[in-house]
């Protein structure tokens, strides 16, 4: 919604094909549980201005590139289309007036199962036979390849004009994606519904094994900007949930050691109370050099400060005693090896960075 308002307001000043990414906190009325939060960070990528299937392929490629860079290899980008969904509902005998309500129910298939979805479809006014036929049409094709799913959908959608057009659009997206990193991860999935009614075309969702829910999702929303501008503006986007990604990476041990271990690169010791300003200034300069630095805040014995540094997982410790101060230098100890060297303070940041 915020992006749609911005595009509507500045449409005349934006390029014809406008792309953007954004990482920001969002809030939703959700029940907190593993991987689900009321406040969370969302990573968005959107492309405005074209109805071409090139856009979907590029959006999926961007998401795939990010996940691969983070170390994911077993993710699946589930792909479907709103017109395919409506065509399947038509073929099952669900009247058009109930399509939106039916899609909200079908979007819960992963969470409540077939029996739960069927019961909700009936509650929403879909007949028993039509509900059963819809569930059969929306059966997940997790064990089938894209060609087999395509064949099944083509058979079900025969004679459904918009549904056939939607399937053809999915074929174009798959074809365009073969030259991207997303190509080997995209799977046609008739069970993917995404209940948000503003989607108008292709929809997608990222799944990984052993995670209830998804790492993110998105789709084409060609009418959303028009709600604010009064003009039709094609758009497509994808959102990744940062916290969910972090949960999975943590459980799988995917973080590199320098990230998984929270210790500082350097612990700056405090020689005595009179040297507090000197230690703070040294820490400031080392942080400016791009180092993670912690200052020991009390003038305890150096042995105690070294013990603390070791417990914190610090890589190096700096000690500026009276002799070092007179030379404009610092004694640097590498905790893993015990090696010590005296380094000019002016060179210290670069010297440490070269050894991290």
List the predicted regions and their residue ranges.
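Positively charged, Gly/Ser-enriched RNA/tRNA-binding surfaces
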Residues: 2-73, 115-356
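Hydrophobic mid-domain F-helix/FG-region of cytochrome P450s
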Residues: 62-68, 83-91
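Short, surface-exposed recognition loops or helix-turn segments adjacent to catalytic cores
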Residues: 74-85, 102, 187-193
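Short, surface-exposed, charged loop/turn segments at secondary-structure junctions
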Residues: 92-94, 204
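Acidic, His- and aromatic-enriched active-site or binding-groove loops in soluble protein domains
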Residues: 94-115
């Amino acid at each position: 919604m915020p992006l749609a308002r911005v595009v509507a307001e500045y449409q005349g000043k934006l390029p014809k094909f406008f792309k953007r990414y954004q990482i920001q906190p969002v809030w939703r009325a959700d029940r907190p549980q593993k991987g689900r939060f009321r406040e969370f960070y969302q990573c968005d990528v959107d492309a405005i201005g074209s109805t071409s299937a090139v856009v979907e392929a590029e959006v999926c490629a961007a998401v795939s590139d990010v996940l691969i860079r983070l170390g994911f290899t077993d993710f699946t980008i589930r792909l479907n289309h709103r017109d395919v969904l409506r065509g399947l509902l038509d073929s099952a005998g669900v009247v058009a007036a109930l399509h939106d309500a039916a899609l909200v129910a079908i979007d819960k298939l992963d969470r409540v199962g077939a029996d739960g979805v069927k019961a909700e479809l009936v509650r929403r006014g879909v007949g028993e036979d039509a509900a059963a036929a819809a569930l059969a049409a929306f059966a997940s094709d997790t064990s089938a390849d894209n060609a087999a799913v395509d064949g099944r959908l083509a058979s079900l959608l025969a004679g459904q004009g918009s549904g056939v057009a939607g399937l053809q659009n999915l074929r174009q997206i798959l074809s365009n994606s073969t030259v991207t990193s997303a190509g080997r991860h995209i799977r046609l999935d008739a069970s993917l519904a995404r209940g948000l009614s503003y989607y108008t075309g292709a929809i997608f969702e990222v799944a990984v094994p052993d995670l209830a829910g998804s790492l993110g999702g998105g789709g084409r929303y060609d009418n959303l900007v028009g709600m604010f501008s009064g003009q039709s503006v094609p758009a497509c986007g994808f959102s990744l949930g940062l916290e969910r990604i972090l949960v999975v990476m943590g459980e799988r041990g995917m973080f590199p050691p320098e990230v998984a271990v929270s210790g500082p690169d350097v612990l700056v010791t405090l020689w005595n109370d009179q040297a507090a300003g000197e230690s703070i200034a040294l820490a400031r300069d080392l942080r400016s050099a791009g180092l993670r630095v912690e200052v020991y805040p009390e003038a305890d014995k150096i042995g105690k400060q070294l013990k603390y540094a070791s417990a914190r997982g610090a890589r190096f410790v700096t000690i500026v005693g009276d002799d070092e101060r007179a030379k404009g230098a610092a004694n640097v100890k590498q905790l893993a090896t015990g090696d010590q060297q005296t380094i000019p303070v002016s060179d210290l940041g670069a010297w440490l960075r070269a050894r991290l």
